[in-house]
Amino acid sequence: QQKAIRFWLFEKGNPDHIIGTMSIQRISRGIFQSCVIGYKMDAAYRDMGYMTEALHFLISFIFTELKLHRIEAYVNPDNNASIHLLKKLEFTEEGIAHGSAWIQGVWQDHLRFALISGPKS
């Protein structure tokens, strides 16, 4: 059974206004101890640092509370803002996942990024 955790991001001071979401998906235990994250921010709230702040929380939650070892994120190669965000958060680009997402009737490639818990080598 697929397990996932979703977080809703609210505008500060306005808990009725959702401005974004984050999710932890494909949580794998056993030998892998990994997950995949997804995130989305309302266009009006981009470039304000909110998603950076939220993902710092999410990364800490995954490594500290869930005690996972590896976080993966898949990004459309044209999504420069998301690529920049992941690199700022010290994710490493690992390559291309060819034909990994069925979007608008077409199998599309995505870049795979990963972050490993513990000290960076």
For each predicted feature, which ranges?
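Active-site rim helix/loop that mediates acceptor-substrate recognition in acyltransferases
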Residues: Q1-A4
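Acyl-donor (CoA/ACP) binding surface of acyl/acetyltransferases
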Residues: R6-S121
